[in-house]
Amino acid sequence: MAHVAKKFKAASAKVDRVKRYKLDEAMSLVKQTATKKFDETVDAAINLGVDPKHADQVVRGAVVLPHGMGKAVKIAVFAKGDKAREAQEAGADIVGAEDLAEKVQGGFMDFDKVLATPDMMGVVGRLGKVLGPRGLMPNPKVGTVSADIARAVKEQKAGKVEFRVEKAGIVHVPFGKASFEPEKLKANFSAIMEIIYKAKPQTAKGVYVKNVTLSTTMGPGIKLDLSELAAAHG
């Protein structure tokens, strides 16, 4: 543990806790603060001026990252007939209907994402207690329930990420790996922020994006210069 603490302290020493960093500098710095032997995920914590207790201020959405997430995603699809075939041809790892639902009810969870065609939601809905707590329940608002199931599969395989504001008004979303080049991290992050700004609720008052902090899985937080973000996306 002392060795781990020493590494974290060394990484933290590279970050000025008071400074708000420009994007280019932040993306280079986030790579420097990754100290683990595994390829750490890079996350953004985006503090929004919304009150999620009000339904009209719940910010959620999804975006296909231009450079993906740097990992293979195992996808389960609930579909029948031609739609099942389309899902398989698009690269889905597991495709089924009632048979797949029975497996999931029995404890089968060997997948990262769950997609469904609209006609299958009656079956999938019964899995709410299993899929819901794991954040796997398909939802049309983020494109995981879709009639164009082939496109939905391809987007997930390409690195689609979903986000939803939490109780404290914060959105946590991953946007790459520490091994990515800074330019790729920047492009992925910018794609997320574009959607975040577009998702601003009409009822939100005051400052919308209040704070943004980047970090690797085990690294220190790096605060961003909000004026640069507002100029690019606001």
Swiss-Prot record:
GO BP, one annotated term: translation
Keyword Repeat assigned: no
InterPro entries: Ribosom_uL1_bac-type, Ribosomal_uL1, Ribosomal_uL1-like, Ribosomal_uL1/biogenesis, Ribosomal_uL1_3-a/b-sand, Ribosomal_uL1_CS
Cited Gene3D superfamilies: 3.30.190.20, 3.40.50.790
PROSITE patterns: RIBOSOMAL_L1
Reported function: Binds directly to 23S rRNA. The L1 stalk is quite mobile in the ribosome, and is involved in E site tRNA release. Protein L1 is also a translational repressor protein, it controls the translation of the L11 operon by binding to its mRNA.
Family: Belongs to the universal ribosomal protein uL1 family.
Protein name per its UniProtKB record: Large ribosomal subunit protein uL1
Species, as recorded: Anaeromyxobacter sp. (strain Fw109-5)
Name of the gene: rplA
